[in-house]
């Protein structure tokens, strides 16, 4: 774009406005013109035809000619010399203001993309400029869609606190610059952790799928213990062989359910049936033991009672023999007197027969 267009009769006399317009004079910047010179001149002529007469904006406001939003225009009908209108370029939300449908590449687009490089006094080589011109603004299409997602991932991983979102399409990591030949040593002040702000359409060799795989690679060992046990079962270890009979019987239901996470439903049902069988067997053995113990107690008591009965029988026999002895002795004593009166002595309380 020529300098005559930037200097019009309606240019305001404010020094700040003049400095603002002169900062965007495109004649100061070097743009590669071998392959795209004719295309750039055609776009410039088309943009000049669409430029309104009352505007002195350095960038055309027609969106098919440029994907960069137009700067605040200075027309005599609207005198808005607010400072916030002049500071639209350094704002962090610059990539979000771009129309995602405009894909035309103009010298203005290339200059705006290379502002970050020329600001440090290290202009890139011409072939790097061509690569940046070809792929830089393709990433601007989804920049405002992925800006919130990058901020959310930045909050989730606070170790990437060096994240900066200046230009989503310009790679700042030294690994990302490996895809561009001759680009090492470029941007020494922007080698930050830029893993999570890469756009899906960015020409960087590090794709979001690789970043996603790299992110999940660190969290892979934190799987569920039941799932690891399930992989162990597939390695030849049966679910019934993982626990002994004593462990199944003594283990609580909550602990058993925690160990059975990751197994199939059939294996869980089979193991619980085995546990129920073992518990029933334990209950039966306990009842049998109690019955045997009670039987032993009863048998011991019976033996004691039998012994007591034998002792009582022996006592009865002894008393019977003693009785017979006393009876014979009494008969001998009565027979020695020589007379016996029938029934006379039986009624006498003093006779021995009275007690028999």
Curated annotation (Swiss-Prot):
Domain bZIP per the UniProt entry, residue ranges: 270-333
Location, primary (coarse class): nucleus
InterPro entries: bZIP, bZIP_Maf, bZIP_sf, Maf_TF_N, TF_DNA-bd_sf, Transcription_factor_Maf_fam
Comp. bias regions, Basic residues: 183-196, 212-223
Domain of life: Eukaryota
Coiled-coil annotated residue ranges, if any: none
Subunit structure: Homodimer or heterodimer with other bHLH-Zip transcription factors. Binds DNA as a homodimer or a heterodimer.
The family this protein is said to belong to: Belongs to the bZIP family. Maf subfamily.
Protein name: Transcription factor MafB
Organism lineage string: Eukaryota, Metazoa, Chordata, Craniata, Vertebrata
């Amino acid at each position: 774009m020529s300098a005559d267009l930037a200097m019009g009769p309606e240019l305001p006399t404010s020094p700040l406005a003049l400095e603002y317009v002169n900062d965007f004079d495109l004649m100061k910047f070097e743009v590669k013109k071998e392959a795209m010179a004719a295309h750039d001149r055609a776009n410039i002529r088309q943009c000049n035809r669409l430029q309104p007469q009352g505007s002195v904006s350095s960038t055309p406001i027609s969106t098919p000619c440029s994907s960069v939003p137009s700067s605040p225009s200075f027309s005599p009908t609207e005198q808005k010399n607010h400072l916030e209108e002049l500071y639209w370029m350094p704002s962090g939300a610059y990539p979000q203001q771009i129309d995602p449908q405009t894909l035309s590449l103009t010298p203005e687009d290339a200059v705006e993309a290379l502002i970050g490089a020329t600001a440090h006094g290290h202009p890139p080589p011409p072939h790097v400029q061509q690569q940046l011109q070809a792929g830089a603004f393709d990433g601007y299409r989804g920049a405002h869609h992925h800006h919130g997602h990058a901020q959310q991932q930045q909050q989730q991983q606070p170790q990437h606190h060096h994240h900066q979102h200046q230009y989503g399409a310009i790679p700042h990591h030294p690994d990302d610059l490996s895809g561009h030949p001759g680009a090492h040593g470029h941007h020494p002040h922007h080698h930050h952790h830029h893993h999570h702000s890469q756009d899906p359409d960015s020409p960087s060799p590090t794709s979001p799928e690789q970043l996603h795989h790299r992110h999940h690679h660190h969290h892979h060992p934190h799987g569920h213990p039941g799932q690891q046990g399930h992989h162990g079962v597939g390695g030849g270890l049966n679910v019934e062989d993982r626990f002994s009979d004593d462990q199944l019987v003594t283990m609580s239901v909550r602990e058993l359910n925690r160990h059975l996470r990751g197994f199939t439903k059939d294996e869980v049902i089979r193991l619980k049936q085995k546990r129920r069988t073992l518990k029933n067997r334990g209950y039966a053995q306990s009842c049998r033991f109690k019955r045997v113990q009670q039987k032993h107690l009863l048998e011991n008591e019976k033996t004691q009672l039998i012994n007591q009965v034998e002792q009582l029988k022996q006592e009865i026999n002894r008393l019977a023999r003693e009785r017979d002895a006393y009876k014979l002795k009494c008969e001998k004593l009565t027979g020695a007197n020589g007379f016996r009166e029938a029934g006379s002595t039986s009624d006498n309380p003093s006779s021995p027969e009275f007690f028999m």
